[in-house]
């Protein structure tokens, strides 16, 4: 992968941390795409959650949850872009920034898995797990950033 990135980068050597950051951005964008493609499934899931208790709230909840997931996804992508920019400029605070986004992103992803209402998850399990995947790239990125010192 690094050799391909080097060729695309005009022959300049690309660090492994930069590759991990780029992979994290791609994974984040795929997570956003999953939310967009699964809007109907998310709304159907929430109809099941609210069916016995508040069927009138199911449609509204679907829109709220989808909007929330999209906003979180876009903010995550912005975090990846900011981290890539800081790394490319070789700023002193790149590692702190990467750690901050890793912790915040992972906490949000775990929260998405844990949020329940009426005993059921608000975010479908498969989508909650998919939201954790960019954190794996983030863990790789912060590890590689510390090795670059």
Name each region found by the language model.
Residues 2-149:
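Topology signature of small-to-medium multi-pass alpha-helical membrane proteins
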């Amino acid at each position: 992968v690094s050799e391909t990135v080097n060729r695309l980068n005009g022959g300049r050597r690309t660090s492994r941390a930069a590759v991990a950051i780029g992979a994290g951005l791609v994974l984040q964008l795929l997570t956003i795409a999953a939310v967009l493609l699964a809007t109907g499934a998310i709304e159907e899931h929430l109809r099941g959650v609210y069916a016995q208790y508040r069927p009138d709230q199911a449609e509204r909840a679907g829109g709220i949850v989808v909007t929330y997931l999209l906003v979180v996804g876009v903010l995550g992508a912005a975090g990846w872009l900011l981290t890539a920019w800081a790394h490319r400029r070789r700023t002193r605070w790149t590692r702190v920034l990467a750690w901050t986004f890793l912790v915040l992103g992972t906490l949000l992803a775990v929260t998405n898995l844990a949020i329940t209402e009426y005993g059921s998850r608000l975010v479908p399990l498969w989508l909650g797990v998919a939201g954790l995947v960019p954190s794996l790239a983030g863990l790789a990125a912060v590890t590689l950033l510390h090795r670059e010192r």
